[in-house]
């Protein structure tokens, strides 16, 4: 991420610059005093979004394309993808506004909210009330993000942009599925998230296998694919283990394992134990494939699970926080110190060459992921 402290200095400048551009653009649009909802107002907003995106692209050509500065490139990539995809999506929104029937949309929403339980019939009724121009909006939003992120990655080969493109790709697939069969996506959301996470994880493995020594941009892209895959896999695995494949909207855990303290004590304790078991499996996989991203993404959930367990000791809030941080910090430091020796033990039974060695690289390669 860093070549030297100059990268941090430049990144701070980039963040300040685009924060100012965003606020300035909003103020400029307001100063035009255009009629709200008019074509000229929409055109001005789209133009301002596109201009900020183009500025991010221009700086990327200098900082990423020529100077290969990774950390500023991550910020610029995010700015470009957000503003460019918003501009593209806004164009579609403006085109369909003339066909938008608010009464039909309200009726479609009411057909879902008026039912006490999710059913395929309710979703079918909702779809029947919505025109295709509205139903396709998720695909347009997801497709815009995918096209923009893929364009950035193909232009600058920034590893972060590659990971973001992978995330946009699986998100686009999920949104397309949502348009075709919303009931299945909503009802079986934990299973869908697991499939998305597995797709990103396998993509990361594919990039890693092409660079087992972890020395090129390929492994950098693999890192970010693992980084984006890990939260999906962890949340989906914990939710599946506790609530099953179907989404449970009434349980706070249905939103994610980090909300386990909001559940009943017995349920929270069970969720904490399951979470730690899943995280332990993730840690084992991380050691085998030499990727810390799977562990890093689970630190928050690990901390929450440990806090739930420590809370059983009857300590006050400060005591729970102190013990949790001590245990969590100790685990991270221990993994950092013993990473290579433990990997040496775990990878010893595996071959040191061939296809398996590209997926589970031996310690002899020396580089850490």
Regions inferred by a protein language model and the residue ranges of each:
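Alpha-helical multi-pass membrane segments and their bilayer interfacial helix-loop junctions
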Residues: 1-369
């Amino acid at each position: 991420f860093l070549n030297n402290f100059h990268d941090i200095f430049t990144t701070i400048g980039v963040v300040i610059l685009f924060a100012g551009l965003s606020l300035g653009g909003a103020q400029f649009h307001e100063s035009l005093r255009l009629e709200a909802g008019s074509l000229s107002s929409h055109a001005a907003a789209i133009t301002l979004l596109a201009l900020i995106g183009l500025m991010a692209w221009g700086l990327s050509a200098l900082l990423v394309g020529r100077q290969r500065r990774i950390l500023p490139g991550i910020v610029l990539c995010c700015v470009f993808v957000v503003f460019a995809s918003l501009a593209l999506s806004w164009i579609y929104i403006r085109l369909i506004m003339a066909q938008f029937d608010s009464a039909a949309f309200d009726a479609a929403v009411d057909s879902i909210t008026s039912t006490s339980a999710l059913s395929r019939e309710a979703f079918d009724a909702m779809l029947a009330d919505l025109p295709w121009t509205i139903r396709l909006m998720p695909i347009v939003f997801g497709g815009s993000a995918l096209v923009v992120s893929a364009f950035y990655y193909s232009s600058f080969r920034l590893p972060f942009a590659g990971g973001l493109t992978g995330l946009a790709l699986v998100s686009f697939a999920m949104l397309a599925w949502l348009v075709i069969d919303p009931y299945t996506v909503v009802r079986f959301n934990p299973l869908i998230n697991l499939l998305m996470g597995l797709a990103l994880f396998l993509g990361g493995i594919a990039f890693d296998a092409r660079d087992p020594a972890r020395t090129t941009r390929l492994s950098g892209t693999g890192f970010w694919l693992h980084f984006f895959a890990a939260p999906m896999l962890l949340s989906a695995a914990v939710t599946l283990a506790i609530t099953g494949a179907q989404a449970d909207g009434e349980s706070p855990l249905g939103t994610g394992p980090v909300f386990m303290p909001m559940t009943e004590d017995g349920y929270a304790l069970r969720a904490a134990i399951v979470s730690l078991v899943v995280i332990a499996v993730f840690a084992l996989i991380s050691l085998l494939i030499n990727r810390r991203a799977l562990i890093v993404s689970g630190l928050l959930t690990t901390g929450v699970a440990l806090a739930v367990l420590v809370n059983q000791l009857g300590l006050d809030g400060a005591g729970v926080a102190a013990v949790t941080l001590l245990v969590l910090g100790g685990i991270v430091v221990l993994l950092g110190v013993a990473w290579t020796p433990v990997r040496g033990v775990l990878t010893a039974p595996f071959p040191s060459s061939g296809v398996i060695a590209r997926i589970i690289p031996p310690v002899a390669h020396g580089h850490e992921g």
